[in-house]
């Protein structure tokens, strides 16, 4: 067993105890009862919804280039030769391997060749699924859904169990809370006999400025998940993919608790809108390049989530301190009247987010 502590978090590896998870991360945070996932409005998001999967992102695909970066790994001393043999043994003969080890374990190089290949290798066999422990946040809707996408809500325990049942418990790690820190401190590889803790550490630390996300993560581990080198700046290596679906993590479709559409989703750039009454609106997607995803989305909701639909809203909220503007969501009813035509009905059941 190895142990690492940083910023109030404890990272523990259990390589020799098969009765325990390979890695345990204790952030002294209570797991939320519900977690949410925000989606922008595009074909990939709709496919993920209707096929009940999350895309487990490669670090190159994250919106913070410091997130899970190889720069979060460093050394203050030489690494054991066994690490080089395990990583480079099939690529170099013994003489070249010894030469690489000697050069790489200098103060100037600081094991950069090892760190680079180690990171590239593990990034091909893991992916990150980011969720939020907050049902509402004034920044999450514009940042991740552009106020036009949608949000899914899950019971945390149901989601964890569902993903583990679908892809195998040994391929799922987490749910872990993110360790938000004032500074990004790289972890010293030379302090560890195995590199499980350094790997999970680099996937778990973010600057405190991101703490508004209240992020919780699954780490998915599979073979040949792929490395999208083309998404890395100035990188000339070709993308490596066997099957993009290796980055999909499926869940049971019936565990979605709610779907909330963004406040700006329904507008006249997307729909012909007929206000039948204050409560009832008829929607017809406008034929254009985007209309197909709107049809697929509303068909799916009306067939599978019609009793779980909400719409993001805004109201004036009166209190002893005066009037303020707050976000809300209102439960809606949806019926598919005919092909490409939908009836949306307000229920006036409004949830406030102060």
Feature names for model-found ranges:
Residues 1-354:
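Partner-binding and oligomerization surfaces adjacent to conserved cores of proteins
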């Amino acid at each position: 067993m190895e142990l690492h502590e940083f910023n109030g978090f404890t990272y523990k590896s259990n390589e020799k105890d098969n009765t325990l998870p390979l890695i345990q991360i204790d952030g002294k945070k209570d797991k939320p009862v519900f977690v949410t996932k925000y989606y922008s409005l595009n074909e990939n998001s709709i496919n993920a919804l209707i096929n009940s999967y999350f895309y487990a992102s490669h670090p190159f695909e994250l919106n913070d280039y410091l997130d899970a970066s190889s720069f979060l790994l460093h050394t203050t001393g030489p690494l054991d030769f066994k690490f080089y043999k395990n990583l480079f043994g099939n690529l170099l003969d013994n003489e070249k391997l010894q030469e690489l080890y000697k050069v790489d374990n200098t103060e100037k190089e600081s094991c950069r060749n090892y760190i680079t290949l180690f990171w590239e290798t593990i990034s091909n066999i893991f992916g990150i699924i980011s969720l939020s422990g907050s049902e509402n946040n004034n920044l999450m809707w514009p940042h991740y859904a552009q106020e036009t996408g949608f949000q899914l809500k899950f019971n945390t325990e149901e989601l964890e169990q569902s993903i583990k049942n679908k892809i195998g418990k040994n391929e799922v790690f987490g749910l872990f809370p993110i360790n938000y820190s004032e500074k990004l401190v790289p972890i010293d590889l030379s302090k560890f006999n195995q590199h499980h803790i350094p790997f999970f550490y680099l996937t778990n630390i973010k600057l405190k400025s991101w703490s508004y996300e209240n992020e919780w993560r699954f780490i998915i581990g599979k073979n040949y998940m792929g490395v999208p080198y083309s998404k890395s700046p100035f990188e000339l290596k070709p993308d490596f993919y066997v099957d993009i679906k290796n980055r999909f993590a499926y869940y049971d479709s019936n565990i979605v608790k709610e779907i909330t559409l963004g406040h700006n989703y329904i507008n006249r750039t997307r729909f012909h809108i007929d206000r039948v009454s204050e409560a009832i609106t008829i929607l017809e997607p406008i034929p254009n390049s985007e209309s197909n995803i709107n049809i697929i989305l509303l068909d799916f909701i009306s067939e599978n989530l019609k009793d779980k639909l909400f719409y993001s809203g805004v109201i004036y909220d009166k209190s002893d301190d005066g009037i303020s503007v707050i976000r809300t969501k209102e439960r809606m009813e949806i019926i598919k009247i005919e092909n490409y035509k939908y009836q949306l009905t307000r229920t006036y059941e409004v949830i406030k987010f102060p």
